Amino acid sequence: MRMYDVIEKKRDGGELTDAEIDYFVSGYVAGDIPDYQASALAMAIFYKGMTAHETAHLTMAMAESGDMMDLSAIPGIKVDKHSTGGVGDKTTLVVAPLVASLGVKVAKMSGRGLGHTGGTLDKLESIPGLSIEISEPDFFKQVSEIGVAVAGQTGNLVPADKKLYALRDVTATVDSVPLIASSIMSKKIASGSDCILLDVKCGSGAFMKDVDSAIELADAMVSIGEHVNRTTAALITGMDRPLGKNVGNSLEVIEAVATLKGEGPKDLTDVCVELAANMLNLAGKGSVDDCRKLARQQITNGEGLAKLAQMVKAQGGTDEVIFDTTKFEAAPFRRDIVSETSGYITSMNAELVGISSVALGAGREKKGDPIDPSAGIILERKTGDYVEKGDVIATLLTGDESRLDEGERIFREALAFGESAPELEPLFFARVSKDGVERFA
């Protein structure tokens, strides 16, 4: 077999065989296929697409390119959740303990933040002492004993994706549904859970800017899951405006704790309850309606919060900051962003809010950049709110005073004002499962 022939076949719109896909993935990981041929195939896939079977086989070949976690020794159904990323998206910190507190095991491998979206691991690492580097035996033990663990990817998980993702990033082939779907699902499948819930964001702060492209991606990922016998569903949720009021690392942990106490912002609480309900439903805990009630009950009775504290302690963190969030170290420098006009906030571009928080030190512009755990933004007002000239819209926080001017400049760019209240985008657009697409909006 020659790589040239595989590239030519896809360039001309042909369907690759399983053997051709295996040849490409194993050869690329081994270093036998050079980057220039891999990028030529990625571009051919970008233009010609892939069938559902091709995409599923590519996903499995990538998943099997390294270690595969076998969670079968852990009793019960294991569920995983993946978010395609957004601004203020601290849902894992709420949803994982909520679901685990109802007896469903959550074994989650998470990522770091890159670009304008924050990573769950960076948020968790703002908790003093907490480690996200957990050995495989300890990960298994923690999931078995307390029902939940959130860790960084261990060892040699999906090396094919690491190589292919880095290549797509510099060859303008990121925005391809088969390549995005196989990248996400290969990691989820290699992580070993029985059920996978996908939170596919759409809007200005998301990777997918419109509902139809978000549904197309969700459908591709659900199809892959069903092809490889993983119960999979996806929710399409809005990311036109930041989720909740806090954007940052420790700031988002503080808001997640408030949400588990029943004191969180309504939008964040509603999204977390919906995600938890759908995860519980996939695990066979009842209808989505019944599971929604169960999730809200675990907020009211405090069991979700107790489970988060248990997880933090198990991973070496100081659980007292969960019970008293004032013990988090506060940022030494802050600046109020005051409205220069009176009127309704008609838009608060989530992507620019995210970029502003990165400028303040809450995220990284390139891999390996250090993160300021206390930096970020507290939103006092959001899209749809009326403000008078002089009202505080947000507070910027940072450990480096020199970052405030740039943070403010970008944040102000995110805002638009008008004389009448805007129509707010819904939080939920659709649910995608093996039964098809159910649209809510």
Region annotations inferred by a language model:
Residues 5, 10, 15-17, 28, ...:
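Well-ordered secondary-structure scaffolds
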Residues 123-149, 219-225, 229:
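A glycine-rich helix N-cap at a beta->alpha junction
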Residues 144-195:
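Phosphate/diphosphate-binding glycine-rich loops and adjacent basic-rich segments that engage nucleotide
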Residues 47-48, 93-107, 187-192, 224-228, ...:
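Alpha-helix C-terminal capping segments
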Residues 49-110, 114:
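Active-site cofactor/substrate anionic-group-binding motifs, chiefly glycine-
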Residues 87-96, 100-101, 108-109, 115-118, ...:
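Short glycine/serine/threonine-rich phosphate/pyrophosphate-binding segments
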